[in-house]
Amino acid sequence: MIRILFLVIFIYSFLISKELKEVSLQLPWKYQFQFAGYILAKEKGFYQDINLDVKLKQWDENVDVIDSLTNNKIEYAVLRPTSMIDISKGKELVYLATIFQSSPLVLVTDRSSGISSLSDLKNKRIMTSGDLGSDVSLLSMIFSHGIKLEDLLIQTPSFNTQDLLDKKTDLIASYISNEPFTLKELGGNPIVFNPKDYGFDFYSDILTTSKNTYKMKKMK
């Protein structure tokens, strides 16, 4: 959290106008614990203190975040490591900070599903943000047990953990700080598949901007 605040202050310390400048930050998911630094900074007025009006945008499956960055529709976004693939394909992005040294993404199921190992995932329903391949840690963990993406039935997330107990889905791709706790509170018995436990430990939540935005800020 402190790293985020210092980073924002460092980037914008040159702003001396009292008029607030509106900037947008796209988050990779709905509001929850791991975005506390960004949210708290806004609520406490830290952005306003350095003349910024920061608009926090929650995840939207209809928004192409990379396109929005490179076409100046948004100024900043929190991306996953697979965005390096976009950079290798010519997308002009600049990484500003890596917030998590380990990806918080995990797969969660309830014990009543009968799923006890990753080998049981074939033909199972998974609620995820549309492209499971966008997280290299989850993908590597799944592949290591002989499961292919085409073996999975991808569902649009409902953001309702109760769906695991109601048998509307088999697994949820979630942040470790969120759904496992919620499922237990609902009376479930969560089983968590964490890539870190299988030897796949990657950075995550990378604060990013476009090269164009980065150059414009440096020139001011």
Where are these predicted regions, by residue range?
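Short helices/loops that flank or line small-molecule/ion binding pockets
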Residues: 40, 45, 50, 63-74, ...
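A structural signal for short loop-to-beta-strand junctions that line the ligand-binding cleft
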Residues: 23-27, 91-100, 124-127, 191-198
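Flexible hinge/capping segments at coil-to-helix
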Residues: 110-125, 211-219
